[in-house]
Amino acid sequence: EGEKHVGNVEVKAQYGKGKSVNLVVNGAAXPQEYDLDIKANAPQAENLKKLDLSLKTKNPSPDTYVVLVAIDADGRVYKSQSTVVYSEANPLIDVSYTAPNTPTSRLYVKGVKLSENQAKVEVKIVNIRDLSLDAVSEATLQKDNIILKVVANSEKLGLKNYKVDVATKDANNNGKRLEFQATNDNKNVLSGSTTFISKQENKKTIIEGSGTLKVKEEQKSANFKYIRTILTEGNEQGVETFLNLAVGESSYVAESRITNLEYKNSYVYCEEKKQCAHVELNSKVNIQKPGVVQHTVNVNFDLVKLGISPEFGLQITNEISEKKLPQYTLDLHAIKNDKKYHLNIYSHPELGKFPAGITVTLPHRVLALETRVEYPTNKGLPFPIKGEITIHPDKRKAQYKTAARFLVDVTGSDKQHALIADFGFSHPKLGKEALFKVRGNLKNSDNIIEIATSASVSCHPIFGADRESKFVLQVSPSSFKLLLDTPIVKVIELEGTAVVKENLQQGDLKFCLLQGKPVAVRALIKDYQYYEFTTDESDRKLSVIGHLDPEKRVDISADLVLSGEKKNIAHGALFLKDNLVKSEYGASKDNFDYFVTALKNDLTNLEARVKQLGEEINSDFKDILKRAQPKIQELEKAYKEDLEKIYQEVANDETLKNSQVINEVAQFLAKIIDDIVHAFKPLVDKVYNVIVETTKKIEEIYEKEIAPQIKSLYETVASIVKEFFDGLLDIVAHYAALITDFYEKHKPELEELTNTITEIFKDLTRIIVIQLKELKATVGQALEAIITTIKETQNSVVTALQAKYEELGVPESVLNAILEAHNAIRALLPTEETKNFADAVYTYVSKKLRSEKFDEQAQLRVVYEKFTVALQSLIQFLRGQFNQFGIPSLFNIESIPFITGPGQLSYTPTGVGASLSLVNQILRGDIPDPLSLIQAYRPRSLDPFDEIPAKLRGVVVNGQHIFTFDGRHLTFPGNCRYVLAHDYVDRNFTLVLQLQNGKPKSLILEDKSGTTVELKNNGQVAVNGASHGYPVEEKDVYAFRRPDGVLGIGSQYGALAYCSAKLEVCYFEINGFYLGKLRGLLGDGNNEAYDDFRLPNGKISTSESEFGNSYRLASSCPQAKCPEHSHHQQHAALPPACEQVFGGTSTLRPLSLVLDVAPFRQACIHAVAGNAENALREACSLGAGYVALGLGTLLPAVLPPACVRCTDAGGSKNIGDTYEVKLPNKQADILVVIETTKSNEKKDKDLVVPLVSQVVDTTRNLVVPWNLKSKHIAGIKVYLIGVTSRFPYPIVYDTDLKLKSAKVAFNDEHRYQYTPTIKTNCEKADSIQKTIANVIDEIRIVLGLSNINAGYLSAFETPLRPGALKHVITVNGDACKLEIGTPLQAISNIITYNQLGITHSLVASIPGLEVDGKSAPNVIGYTNDYALEFDGKKHAKEVQGAKVTLTEDNYCAELTEVTDGLVLSATNYNALGAGERKQFLLAAANAITQRILQESIVEECVCNYANPFVGRSAC
């Protein structure tokens, strides 16, 4: 409502039976007035049915503050009205209080400044603790003259026509004395005189004196001292006074301080024995440092001496800072009869810490609610995060507190990542904190990967001992470790190592299953001649050892070692003896049977271990059920007792009862607490009873049904495992028989070998083949037997499992238990919809358990539909339950400042409320608008870290339409140099725009060292005022031109600008580091639009003209006047030109859904007003600025077709127009793309520059002079572009037709960018780094993900003219490597070059060039059709059909050849003498010119978008 902001909240709740509570909060805020009304109704409440609270604050004038507080409790109205006037001439304090059963109380203090040294004060106290006072005082205070007159009346204080006259009189000794005269009811109270001494010390006036006064009928000594100080230094201006008066044993001290920052009055009256009465009021504003304002209010009353109690004190402290959250502290205390009551509320958020709490101190206990959240601010990530909430029934007894805490910490580096999470809950009845811990660790260092996780529960003995689970996995090239530990049993512990060397291969494995006996296994190979396999347990060892030395011995032996004694199971050997081959083998059936028996015993033990675990789990679960029931009852009883004690203390406190208002509120609060306890009690009792009954039923079902089934399951699994391994042992025995049979069967052949040893070398191969054939058959039979045995064993195992499963089934008793549990849960559910959902789930589960056939998808669909309905009903139910106890689901009340004293800090309410959480929003039904979420949280960069913090973006169109970083629009037709953006904190950069008659003339960037780079509206660039070609690379600033003609300027400190060639549109992008640190026409960049028009001095201006002119860099420039802006213009009807660009049918319409278009519409209305001739051009320029802003944040956008033309084919073509272009004609475009490697510097100077000159200029000494100028090609353009490995975009150089003016810097070491490594001085680590880096680099190169490739792609976007002959010369540095896209690129290039009539050539170093298999140092260049080489007389000739090969791969050369390009050898050129080089250049230029002029084509072209801003012919 204009400048007034209104907000309201209404909460309705029901509790108990038919009881309701209604709470309505209305708030309104205007610049000088704030209203807050709170209305609460509880019709069924016993003590208080209606409570209305009204708070109104006004600031009718700069020095006047009015506060009205009214409370209506069931028709009993309590009202307080305060008026404070901070005025040097007429200060005023008027506070009145009205209650139903007592007369109105009032404190009235008014001052009148009659002259510079004369003032009058009127004081009225009406019915304050039965005290009334009416007093008027008038004083004249001069250096040598004091007059004080007081008239007062007060029945309570015994004052009747009480008069005081104090005046200075001349003394006999030419001095002055101060005479006192005070009467009460015409009786002498005080009379006499004192000396009078007055002096002036700078700005202090000091008056003091002493003497004897007659008090009633008694003479008493007296002295006084008065000091008056004028405060003029610093920011504080005002007056401070001090008066100390002592008469006999009594004294009176008064202090006063009235300034623009502080108001203070303090009065102390003391009688003998130091019995004092004290009153103090202090309101102070303290500005500790710029941007930090602290406001403190102190009120203290101690009037016990005057018969008024209790002692009362209040202190409120507020602190507001630009860089910190608001700080708030409230302390309220009252003391009576040695009983202390204290309320402390505090909220002290800091960066990284958020402490807050409430403490209530009563005579017998200290209640406290404290919260604290902490996180570090000196790290990249905000971890660890710690939080705690604590409730103290009595803070003096810390052991009785209830607390919940959490800790989350995430740490990481290149080699290690760790996660720690702790969640704890403590209560006195638990005795020990219930703590749930989670630990996770991932290490990756020195070729070792380690994953370690653990979860533990540490809690009350109700759950037995602390429970912990662990999982550890460690892998490296030479080791492996696995650990899985559960609270019941350590499932597996496995550890293995491996050693692989040239003459040694060894593997060790140690494992322990289900906490059984550890087993060690080793496999060893030495010199590929010694083989060993051993298993080692605590009581036995199995060893299998073999030797393989074909020239001496081949053997194998299996032994069992028991108590150090070796027992052979089987052995076999072939060896040479006396030049004869001997054999030896044997087996021990007893030892083998012993081995098999031992294995069977191990299986039996494993079976028993599995059964034992089943028993342990069974027993543990039953113990937990038995202990849970009494503990739940104990906790419930403890909470009930605590609440009851608190209620009784609050309700029965006698001191609180003496204050009618406090007593009413306390009773109301106590009643609410009592109602909540009693309303929740039936629900708690019901839940408790259900838990108890369900626990009993679960225990009963577990004992009778589930436990026997689990026991049977463990026994079944154990027996099946044993049966399976028994089958494996049978297989092993079968293999042993096969092996024995093999040796028996081939014994004659082995004996025959002994007789034929002399022919061993001739027949060895034949024998081996025979043995292998027979071995193959034997192995085949063995494999068949293995497969058959496994199948039979598997089938038997599966059959046994199926039989056991069918036998087990699902007992009816279990189904009945599930039904009872379902009925118990259903009884607890609060709504009919949730009960229907429970029924649907039970129906589905029971059908699955009974193996009934049904449509499962349809049933699940029913469950889902009922779930959604149940969820909605549950949300509504919870909202109702919360509301009935005054717990709102959303707190969205605008803050209303409370007037507490001078120097009030006003603010502009934003009108934006924030819900506490997404859950609250859902409960409230306030689902965020998806479009708003997209606008707020959409990605704005391909690199998410590039937007941390978010960048600042702005646009300037035609120099005068300025769109700030925070989205405001300013039309400023200036005629001077103006600051666009300036880092006023660190002064890292300044952006300046020079305007001439409202049009842009230049854009200037200055770095912190004073270096300036200037973009001019003619496309040129200057450095420190001197002309300079593109690119510009200074220490901290740079400038460039892109192939498409866009100009750029930037700073290494985070400022970047892109402009069109004539500066019509400039897009600015500033790093988010400068949030709130900028000044200039683009705003302060703090994400707050309202303060964008901030002047250099920090003041916020409401005048656009004042704002714009304040950033002139020369005061002599004329002041510009801005056109009037109004809000309705942003949504007004658009002129026709603006409708074409920003209307509903424009291509920019989709962009307006995400990016606010209103400021650009407003700017368009201004731009086309009175400018019909250029209206569309002005509108299109603004459209281009809007598109630039969208593209800068990843939003797709394109200018409307009405704004885009093609002008590169002669004339102006509309988007979509088609036309023909014939070649050749009188134009030629030559594009030279050179790689900026150091190896190309000499090549560029000696070969490329003269070559291009020869192509362009006249060529002599040739029989047929082929060149462009000789063929009357006059319209020649030469483009020079560099590509580099340093960044993925090209460098456009300013150059002439002969490349002689270009300033190319050859700084690259290599053609490709390579991954850097860190030298660790550890040879192994450095080697691993290098290997990984090489792999990454090769992958990047093969995939074409190099900066060189990206630079080439952008370079080929250079706008070559469709009607010109086109030739591309690429200059390679290093040899090109193979990429996956090379064949596709070749095909694409062939199509493109043929369609556009582009010819191309490559200049590259090509060592090892051969023609027809012979070295060819005379070759100038070659194509896929011929080789160009020198003849015997050093004349160039074409050798058709010559086959050119390269001894070193260069895929760029191959690609050029395949696409019908010309490859020129820089290697052969460098080997020539000066005269031969000249012939080389003439021949190469002739070849290039012939290829350019040989094209004769007719192109079909269409005008299309080249980018969102520009049209270009596509032919």
Curated annotation (Swiss-Prot):
It is found in: Secreted. Disulfide bonds join C976-C1117. The keyword Flavoprotein does not apply. Keywords: Coiled coil, Disulfide bond, Glycoprotein, Lipid transport, Lipid-binding, Secreted, Transport. Hemolymph. One of its GO terms (cellular component) is extracellular region. One of its GO terms (molecular function) is lipid binding. PROSITE patterns: VWFD (PS51233). The keyword Disulfide bond applies. Residues 952-1118 form the VWFD domain. InterPro entries: ARM-type_fold, VWF_type-D. GO terms for biological process: lipid transport. Glycans are attached at N988. Mediates transport for various types of lipids in hemolymph. Acts by forming lipoprotein particles that bind lipoproteins and lipids. Binds the A.niger cell wall component alpha-1,3-glucan, a fungal pathogen-associated molecular pattern (PAMP) that activates the host immune response. This is Apolipophorin. It comes from Galleria mellonella (Greater wax moth).
